[in-house]
Amino acid sequence: MTQLAIGEATPHGATYDGHGVNFTLFSAHAERVELCVFDSRGNERRYDLPGRRGDVWHGYLAGARPGLRYGYRVHGPWQPAQGHRFNPAKLLLDPYARRVEGELKDHPLLHGGHDEPDYRDNAAVAPKSVIISDHYDWEDDAAPRTPWGKTVIYEAHVKGLTYLHPELPQEIRGTYKALGHPVMVAYFKQLGITALELLPVAQFASEPRLQRMGLTNYWGYNPMAMFALHPAWASSPETALDEFRDAVKALHRAGIEVILDIVLNHSAELDLDGPTFSLRGIDNRSYYWIRDDGDYHNWTGCGNTLNLSHPGVVEYACECLRYWVETCHVDGFRFDLASVMGRTPTFRQDAPLFAAIKACPVLSTVKLIAEPWDIGEGGYQVGNFPPPFAEWNDHFRDAARRFWLPRNLTTGEFACRFAASSDVFKRNGRTPGASVNLLTAHDGFTLRDCVCFNQKHNEANGEENRDGTNSNYSDNHGKEGLGGPLDLMERRRDSIHALLATLLLSQGTPMLLAGDEHGHSQHGNNNAYCQDNALTWLDWQQANRGLTTFTAALIRLRQQIPALTGNSWWEEGDGNVRWLNKNAQPLSADEWQNGPKLMQILLSDRFLIAINATLEVTDIVLPEGEWRAVPPFAGEDNPVITAVWQGPAHGLCVFQRG
């Protein structure tokens, strides 16, 4: 290999062209950038990047090939009070690295947030970037592009979903390969979901605190390399990218979209006591929101916050998203703590990143889902994201639980949430699909735990049960824990059925947590982010098959109801919905606000949802006509009903007009 040629300022990152590699690095405040390459024995050779265009440093290394390990040393001022922490003694990861060799260890040589610089070299323990060739034969792959009105999302963890599946080959359980295996594809199709939403698959690290406790970051919300696949779920780091793309291709052939949970709000460098391995040493002042004293704005609760209003960081974020769409053919993203994306530092709908995404012909046409909050002032922004974003709707989650698990909730509030929270989302040209309805998600109780525990039980996390929310709106039905007498277990079953029916038969985009259709429990742990064990892995052999069948039937029913699949707002008199009381009359103003939790919802003039959320058996007079219960509510003896349904306590039934 020879000395570096000047090369080009684009594309960003390290690009192999068949003859060598073009390297670029964004740093607005650097004074000099060294490219460091390593041979198989760890010997290092350094080259100055000779070119600079604007804030992008660049150079071309002829003869460099895939497999080359490299990093950067960045020279510049050490001025912590001004946010500058340049230290060429520290080897740094390329923010655009497609593959990373080595883990991020809790090691003193990786710390760089102190007042004085540490001039000890860290190359022996620092992770290294690796050049790859990302050629792949996609064959005839095509994005399913499922309309929002027909979309049913299934949130899952790559490992936890398949690690205990007895019908999968042992060697692929808990891996990317398993996601596209015919056993899993057949299950997804049988269940009826249309989109698989994966918890973070970009390479992440375990926080030093967890490492010292002997725990690991299981969920993956601690990003280390945003362009690289997490290697632990692949046969080898070298094959991770192709194995993931194989899974995407197999899912697409079955008509199933793949949505990635992505963490564009902070990095694994954490606070000033965290490791320095990339952005902090490359251009701390540009990449992060810095306070006047040089410390970080911690609007994420993770120690730092990415400055997604800086032009260079906006470009980085958009290129990351485009990489996953163009190179891996993913169909969309769920953005963790997405209010950070709109901070300028106050939240704005016209924030630079939102504008860039909307203007991008690639990103503006995929599914974009925001977790519409962060922990900073003004961070709660449910309903305020601009099109084309959809949003997680915590109003729906809390209302559904409060309605069915005895809490105070009016019929009017329940109906509003059932109708895609039009008071929140019917603005700026948005459709009902913008409301992503959920009962549960990876953080919080599972659905089964919602009906078995009144209190969180997070002792295994090592924080003396202080972590995790205390606002669960759960109900153990009289006994804390999973077991109980038969009548209690039946009440819990009825509550689960009612909650699932509410989720899957409401207007909006439903999201189902993987395992809820099995009756999966985390034994009351509502923050299992560090539990990579049987607590979080789905036990397929112990799955509640009846509940799975019930859930699949609800999804099939949903797809038959035009009022739910049309993705247009319901208007009075349009035939989509009528709200009735227990006597089949329109709900009065008093019943909306003060009546018992009894109602009927007539959808598309032929599907009737009869609801008794009270504690008493109650007769409900059905509208005129002949009605027959539909699966999963129809029993073997399913007579036509023309007058009254005897609604059991905490009961729900769906009828179709004959």
Curated annotation (Swiss-Prot):
Site (Transition state stabilizer): 443
InterPro entries linked to this entry: GlgX_C, GlgX_Isoamylase_N_E_set, Glyco_hydro_13_cat_dom, Glyco_hydro_13_N, Glyco_hydro_b, Glycogen_debranch_bac, Glycogen_debranch_GlgX, Glycoside_hydrolase_SF
Span list, region Disordered: 459-483
GO MF annotation, one: hydrolase activity, hydrolyzing O-glycosyl compounds
Metabolic or biological pathway: Glycan degradation; glycogen degradation
GO biological process: glycogen catabolic process
Catalytic-site annotation from UniProt: 336, 371
Keyword flag 4Fe-4S: no
EC number: 3.2.1.196
Catalytic activity: Hydrolysis of (1->6)-alpha-D-glucosidic linkages to branches with degrees of polymerization of three or four glucose residues in limit dextrin
CDD domains according to UniProt: AmyAc_Glg_debranch, E_set_GDE_Isoamylase_N
Keywords, comma-separated and alphabetical: Carbohydrate metabolism, Glycogen metabolism, Glycosidase, Hydrolase
TM stretches of this protein: none
KW Hydrolase (keyword) present: yes
Family listed: Belongs to the glycosyl hydrolase 13 family.
Job of this protein: Removes maltotriose and maltotetraose chains that are attached by 1,6-alpha-linkage to the limit dextrin main chain, generating a debranched limit dextrin.
Protein name: Glycogen debranching enzyme
Species whose genome carries this gene: Salmonella schwarzengrund (strain CVM19633)
Gene: glgX
